[in-house]
């Protein structure tokens, strides 16, 4: 009788990238160290080599003593497997053992990425994943900065975090209320998640993981820096689960529409539950969310927008209301009088500590003149 494979291990020896807690028992046949010791350098079974390293390290942050999200685990594994598969099938390095990774192999693949016209952000992310993997195989510091591989004068040498175009839904003439209502008629849970993204500038994961009961806090209980940035607000929406880097924040409840949305959400979501389809796991809700929005054209290929564009919408609308003028990506040609405090507030409401983080949504105001005083004032 054949032995059953662990449900956490795929048929090709790769671990499932959807669990933090499980690792084969030390000394067992599936212990990563035992697997690696049994595979000599140059083995054709390169996927088992990769799988052993991912089973051992993938749940760990590359630099900090903490775990990483399921998404990071999945993206890392998918990229590294794809990297070695393409390297072995499409370049002269057909017998490369992942433990023998060197810069000449990375250079060969970067050349292919450039030929395929991958974006700067994608190239930087791929190199970051390889840098992490190199650390796992005992080659910390081997993977260089992008400039080393693409050249100092390449537009891919440095990743710009400054928005150069408005990524809001309105910029692509998408009627936000009508589109969300259309989606909500098909799936009310996905509709609610999109409403929360639009109404509070939440990331998709934050909206799906929100447990609304108990999430509304007074200014006295809110993060002091968030409360100080919005002294006019008496209540805030506490966001923690699903936030980037696990950093909690408190989003000001500034309008009647926001309060009415929260009241409606709390009537629909049972206490202790999150804003997702009941009976679905977190990963199932995530997959279902993207399935539904793509079905209704929310993609770059169809309507030219993604769900994250609602966060850009919120940021730019918030800035314009606070500053009294449009952001650079919306055609602003000068710095409104309230430019700096408005940028600070946008950064805080989006969960960033640095004011310059707002440039990723609003664009840069470097070089823009101060707005002229209104002579009629």
Where do the model's predicted regions map?
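Short, basic (Lys/Arg/His-rich) helix/loop patches that form interaction surfaces
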Residues: 290-348, 352, 367, 372-376
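N-terminal core-binding DNA-recognition domain of tyrosine recombinases/integrases
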Residues: 56-162
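The alpha-helix within a helix-turn-helix
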Residues: 197, 208, 347
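DNA breakage-rejoining catalytic core of tyrosine-based enzymes
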Residues: 156-179, 245-256
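Active-site/catalytic core of tyrosine-dependent DNA strand-transfer enzymes
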Residues: 252-321
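Conserved tyrosine-mediated DNA breakage-rejoining catalytic core shared by Y-recombinases
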Residues: 209-261
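Basic, Lys/Arg- and aromatic-enriched nucleic-acid-binding interface segment
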Residues: 174-204, 340
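Basic/aromatic DNA-contact patch characteristic of tyrosine site-specific recombinases
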Residues: 1-81, 85
